[in-house]
């Protein structure tokens, strides 16, 4: 079940706090609509993400979730623990560079040890950026304001994108 929830989050791009607040009424005309909790106090912005086949399949699978909730949710800690376990079982253990919050130094850690719900949002934004390369368009789907500095933390120019850019010089 938590694998499905993580995949849903990967194709919707919302924060886990917003995922928990989604209800069946959040689905409007084939899209999920919500006001991000993090920005509710500022200028409320309605985020609308069209549902793809994967998201629709997951919603259908859990259509009988009790109450008005769109999907079954567990506590943040249990969800993050489940994500780490899923990554371990799937063999997603490649080393990644992270910033140690205590020392402020870069360090290598296995992906399965650092994976969390926020990785789904990073995947959503990063995968869209590889396809579209338009931060303003992607920002409309992720809830980032135009020119957002926070958005820059999510997009990654990977090796394939670097190769593609260099071929433009020829």
PLM regions: where:
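Catalytic-site neighborhood detector that most strongly recognizes the C-terminal catalytic loop/helix
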Residues: 38-40, 79, 142-167
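Hydrophobic (often cysteine-bearing) scaffold residues that line and stabilize catalytic clefts
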Residues: 1-2, 75, 79, 117, ...
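DNA/chromatin major-groove-contacting recognition/catalytic segments
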Residues: 45-57, 61, 152-170
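A short, basic/aromatic helix-end/turn motif that makes direct DNA contacts
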Residues: 21-27, 129-131, 139-146, 153-157
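Short, basic (Lys/Arg/His-rich) helix/loop patches that form interaction surfaces
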Residues: 64-69, 84-140, 144
């Amino acid at each position: 079940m938590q694998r499905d929830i993580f995949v849903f989050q990967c194709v919707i791009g919302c924060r886990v706090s917003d995922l928990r607040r989604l209800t069946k009424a959040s689905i409007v005309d084939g899209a999920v609509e919500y006001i991000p909790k993090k920005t509710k106090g500022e200028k409320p912005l309605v985020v609308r993400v069209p549902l793809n086949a994967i998201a629709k399949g997951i919603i259908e699978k859990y259509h009988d979730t009790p109450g008005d909730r769109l999907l079954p949710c567990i506590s943040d800690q249990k969800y993050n623990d489940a994500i780490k376990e899923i990554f371990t079982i799937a063999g997603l253990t490649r080393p990644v560079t992270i910033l140690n919050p205590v020392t402020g130094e870069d360090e290598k850690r296995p992906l399965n040890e650092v994976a969390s719900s926020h990785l789904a949002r990073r995947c959503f934004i990063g995968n869209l950026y590889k396809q579209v390369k338009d931060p303003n368009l992607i920002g409309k789907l992720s809830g980032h304001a135009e020119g957002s500095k926070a958005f820059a933390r999510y997009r990654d120019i990977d090796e394939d994108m670097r190769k593609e850019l260099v071929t433009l010089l020829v």
